Amino acid sequence: MASESETLNPSARIMTFYPTMEEFRNFSRYIAYIESQGAHRAGLAKVVPPKEWKPRASYDDIDDLVIPAPIQQLVTGQSGLFTQYNIQKKAMTVREFRKIANSDKYCTPRYSEFEELERKYWKNLTFNPPIYGADVNGTLYEKHVDEWNIGRLRTILDLVEKESGITIEGVNTPYLYFGMWKTSFAWHTEDMDLYSINYLHFGEPKSWYSVPPEHGKRLERLAKGFFPGSAQSCEAFLRHKMTLISPLMLKKYGIPFDKVTQEAGEFMITFPYGYHAGFNHGFNCAESTNFATRRWIEYGKQAVLCSCRKDMVKISMDVFVRKFQPERYKLWKAGKDNTVIDHTLPTPEAAEFLKESELPPRAGNEEECPEDDMEGVEDGEEGDLKTSLAKHRIGTKRHRVCLEIPQEVSQSELFPKEDLSSEQYEMTECPAALAPVRPTHSSVRQVEDGLTFPDYSDSTEVKFEELKNVKLEEEDEEEEQEAAALDLSVNPASVGGRLVFSGSKKKSSSSLGSGSSRDSVSSDSETSEPLSCRAQGQTGVLTVHSYAKGDGRVTVGEPCMRKKGSTARSFSERELAEVADEYMFSLEENKKSKGRRQPLSKLPRHHPLVLQECVSDDETSEQLTPEEEAEETEAWAKPLSQLWQNRPPNFEAEKEFNETMAQQAPHCAVCMIFQTYHQVEFGGFNQNCGNASDLAPQKQRTKPLIPEMCFTSTGCGTDINLSTPYLEEDGTSILVSCKKCSVRVHASCYGVPPAKASEDWMCSRCSANALEEDCCLCSLRGGALQRANDDRWVHVSCAVAILEARFVNIAERSPVDVSKIPLPRFKLKCIFCKKRRKRTAGCCVQCSHGRCPTAFHVSCAQAAGVMMQPDDWPFVVFITCFRHKIPNLERAKGALQSITAGQKVISKHKNGRFYQCEVVRLTTETFYEVNFDDGSFSDNLYPEDIVSQDCLQFGPPAEGEVVQVRWTDGQVYGAKFVASHPIQMYQVEFEDGSQLVVKRDDVYTLDEELPKRVKSRLSVASDMRFNEIFTEKEVKQEKKRQRVINSRYREDYIESALYRAIME
């Protein structure tokens, strides 16, 4: 049968089917038939129903239907790679939505053919964000319609509701989607890799793109290459439905795809593991849901689910395996069922069509589910506009990531149109019979003098008239730019409701000004503002949320020391104060420089393009004398005392430093840049990194931490080669050590061909005998260096982290082109080494959070423990300074001090403020964790919440046991028991005599650093309501401001001499 299936639709093109009314009556059987013709190989198929079939007589009576949570789709990105964010809007009716969709602002542009409209879509994707009425619970089918009724398809997926009484909205109940021009659905497969059906009730067409399931892994690899940050945070990040990749990019990287246009009155069927995306041509209404066949069961068992959110859709496969694969049930439960999926095979129900040339006589609806699979499943009752609700409805299909923002985003001007090449496929007509099938295809945030920017933080609208002098970096002529990233700023003070999501963190590099030179930098805006929505609390701390990396609250541990025998420590208040002082100093400089414009006509003396022989006497005399050397007090800098570039060269110290770094995970001088991130996010390094004691001097292979995207992405173009040189098939690379300086690197990180990876290998600097050359982009020696394009040298890690630095030969990782680095970067002062050097040197990077001006050299930041992590296209590295690390820091459980009875602590009183109190008793309370049948979970249930057994008497259920849980709404839901968690509880007594029982997370010791939210609400108990009722604070009297007559009007009128005397 495998050989037969391979001959079916070998080109994996999207197929279109025209069933007769008789053929149309049996849904499950017809799905089996189209798979027997190979339709599933494309991942998408179109079915045109008979002309006499109508799901609804008229759509004139739906204008009052409410769209409860419309979303505005903000898209950021460029060059065919985009990320889509959703801003939740207030509820509206279909009538109101139609009026908006057909308005001049949102209506479909004029076009002569589909290819022209497609080009306009991809070019204007980032402008004028449209509104999508998505995920509206309900159906537009009339009650009497039985054929292909999306509300009751009667497939084996209905077993979920039959067995457990659970409905998952949008999965086994229908959803309505009201679209307008440019509303999109990003690349994704269905939840649990299910089938889906989509019917376009009325309105403008909908365009679909599809990648065949057998090539789905290739699309995933491409997406992970362009979005490594999201991929590291969640293996299945495409399920977030946020990633848009244009067909031009797919074609460029050889990803097979097809496209088709769905007209009103047509069905689209997506198949398991079929990646699809698309957009709406204008106002329309579609209805969809998921379904399953027996072929899906294997996909469901192996589906890779989203790991960053526990409320994503998850369906227990137990009932399906037990019923349809009983012979493999025990093997599957033991985790030994390692079946390899063949994407070319049709569903088992299609066997009859592979043996016959014509369809046998049709059976009635009672036989729709083959082999009586659905015996006992009854039709549910549905109203015209109401959803069929089960008795126990718990969850929804998905929670869209939204920002609740009341303001409208202003419409922007469209960029000039460009052509988008697309393939054409021949279309052949065929009769309505089933046998013949018709294949169809239809910049730097500078706070110094020299750069000034207008402040958009107080406005939600960004006018493109103000950005007319912004010129994006030119790309290669053969790769036409499809869209430019839209730079938006949302007023933090106007954000109403909860802020759930924020957009991209950084702005892509661009040349500002009207000139054509890429090095020219001038603008009227204060900073390069990222596309993000920021919430600002009472304390003024800027909080940036990012769904792709979890919930945005970065959990950060102590910075790790990279000296042998040293231990991790927390930063002292003095060090944090220094960072804060630097930040305030930068803000003062920023305020002073506002409005000033100075030409950058002269290169800074420390710019790498300045020839080495032109160094002034000033610079050569920077080396400190022994009397001038101060004793190093900061722990992170003590091992580096002999490595600062203002000290005399010390090759032995460099060698010792390199040897020390080689013994610490990840054992690569280049990968060290992401060391802090991996320790914080992943609790250290996985087994692929190995232990220092286990590493042999040579031939050890480990997995590099740096994605290939970090070497290929630059701010200068989009001609990217995502090849992975010198990487093995399992993603590992050999570690090599220089026999002269002992620096250790991955062959892939440094560009070492396998033939040269030997014990006699030497790094580029040692091979050139340039032992006294230092990195021109930082202040430290040691590490892995490569030659720059001006005969100077740079750290590979510095070149990776600085967006504008470019590897000329990507495979060899050299030379490094530093000529495109903006000059203002070289004026930034590193907060770590500015007190250790007399002059500014090197090139700094800045914190990626909002407008934070904190700057540091890459090597200094890496040594001090600043968290740097891979970012998504078109950026490279996302950097979090200590200032932004602290507010989001969740106290590590292991770092919490033990508390004893009688100890004075700080806790929250019932009045909402924090007071000192005393611990009077310690108790232990047990909480249960369960996973509900709809995929949701709870980890703070009391034992008495389990109603299926008496847990107080008999103890907790066995792990994995099915239980019944009484929820806070009084309903009882099915769930599986996960674990019981004994939690230490503390009974505290306040000075007013009141007592509370709290968890350890809600208690703070007196010597513990308090979060700002606690500091702002910390009070002292007193008998008086107002402490200062009888005392007054000394008020510092300021000199009265002198009143001066406006000189412009001094001579315009006559005033009395007395009045003039008073005024002056």
From Swiss-Prot:
Enzyme superclass (EC): oxidoreductase
Naturally occurring in which organism (per UniProt): Pongo abelii
Modification type N-acetylalanine: residues: 2
Domain Tudor: 897-954, 955-1011
Protein name per the record: Lysine-specific demethylase 4A
Reactions mediated catalytically: N(6),N(6),N(6)-trimethyl-L-lysyl(9)-[histone H3] + 2 2-oxoglutarate + 2 O2 = N(6)-methyl-L-lysyl(9)-[histone H3] + 2 formaldehyde + 2 succinate + 2 CO2; N(6),N(6),N(6)-trimethyl-L-lysyl(36)-[histone H3] + 2 2-oxoglutarate + 2 O2 = N(6)-methyl-L-lysyl(36)-[histone H3] + 2 formaldehyde + 2 succinate + 2 CO2
Similarity comment text for this entry: Belongs to the JHDM3 histone demethylase family.
InterPro entries: EPHD (IPR034732), JmjC_dom (IPR003347), JMJD2A_ePHD (IPR047482), JmjN (IPR003349), KDM4-like_Tudor (IPR040477), Tudor (IPR002999), Tudor_KDM4A_rpt1 (IPR047479), Tudor_KDM4A_rpt2 (IPR047481)
Domain commentary: The 2 Tudor domains recognize and bind methylated histone H3 'Lys-4' residue (H3K4me). Double Tudor domain has an interdigitated structure and the unusual fold is required for its ability to bind methylated histone tails. Trimethylated H3 'Lys-4' (H3K4me3) is bound in a cage of 3 aromatic residues, 2 of which are from the Tudor domain 2, while the binding specificity is determined by side-chain interactions involving residues from the Tudor domain 1. The Tudor domains are also able to bind trimethylated histone H3 'Lys-9' (H3K9me3), di- and trimethylated H4 'Lys-20' (H4K20me2 and H4K20me3).
Boundaries of every JmjC domain copy: 142-308
Pfam families assigned: JmjC (PF02373), JmjN (PF02375), PHD_2 (PF13831), Tudor_2 (PF18104), zf-HC5HC2H_2 (PF13832)
Cofactor binding: number and manner: Binds 1 Fe(2+) ion per subunit.
